[in-house]
């Protein structure tokens, strides 16, 4: 794994020719769906074992403490309350492309939120469950809903289930965003991502270019 730290002000990448400076920027372009540099099967490292033919790009974001997000149809909540942050209190997103086929397509991509999450729900994280399933879990586990409980929101049921847990041990869990509420939540978080535009110095940039007109 290669980890690169950026600060919030200004960053410069310095290195000899062909040591991978452009690769870093192109990887960010791929992660942020910039479209300037397409990801191809040839980008997989040549010594990748047959059992692990994946390209993985992860980005970790600092999150404003106690910032509220509309993750649940108008009900504001925090990423802390949803247990979607990593052990350092950051939002960590990991994108994985399956390179076991002859080419990379849209179906090759899987996206995960890497969180410090309750071990008790690691196999089926609560943000991947529908509201009826969450309500059923509350009934099955004998969760006593407090007075004034607002049953309109999935986050209310998740919060009640988390508070009911006796074993609050946690571990790193990769939460897939491919189904149920997780997909909607990720779309809301995606809207908060910074704008990333890659301008290639070795080509002629024009005002009519797509990445200039629509960065």
In which residue ranges do the predicted regions lie?
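Beta-strand elements of well-folded, non-transmembrane domains
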Residues: 8, 61-65, 97-101
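Core residues of folded domains in eukaryotic genome-function proteins
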Residues: 9, 55-57, 195
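Phosphate-binding P-loop
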Residues: 2-8
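P-loop (Walker A) phosphate-binding loop of NTP-binding proteins
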Residues: 16
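Conserved P-loop NTP-binding catalytic core
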Residues: 25-89
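Electropositive, glycine-dotted interaction segments
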Residues: 75-215
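Conserved lysine of the Walker
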Residues: 21
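Hydrophobic anchor at the beta1->P-loop junction of P-loop NTPases
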Residues: 13
């Amino acid at each position: 794994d290669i980890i690169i730290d950026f600060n919030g002000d200004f960053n410069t990448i310095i290195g000899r020719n062909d040591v991978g400076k452009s690769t870093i920027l192109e990887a960010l372009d791929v992660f942020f769906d910039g479209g300037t540099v397409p990801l191809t099967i040839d980008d997989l490292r040549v010594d990748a074992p047959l059992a692990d033919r994946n390209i993985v790009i992860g980005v970790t974001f600092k999150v404003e403490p106690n910032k509220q997000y509309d993750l649940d149809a108008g009900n504001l909540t925090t990423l802390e309350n949803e247990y979607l942050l990593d052990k350092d209190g950051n939002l960590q997103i990991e994108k994985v492309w399956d390179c076991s086929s002859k080419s990379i397509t849209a179906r090759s991509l899987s996206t995960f939120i890497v969180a410090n999450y309750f071990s008790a729900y690691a196999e089926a994280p609560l943000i991947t469950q529908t509201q009826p399933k969450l309500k059923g879990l509350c009934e099955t586990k004998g969760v006593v809903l407090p007075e004034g409980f607002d049953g309109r929101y999935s986050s209310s049921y998740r919060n009640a289930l988390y508070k009911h847990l006796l074993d609050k041990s946690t571990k790193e869990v990769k939460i897939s965003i491919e189904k149920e509420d997780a997909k909607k939540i990720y779309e809301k978080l995606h809207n908060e991502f910074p704008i990333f535009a890659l301008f290639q110095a070795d080509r002629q940039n024009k005002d009519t270019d797509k990445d200039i007109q629509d960065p």
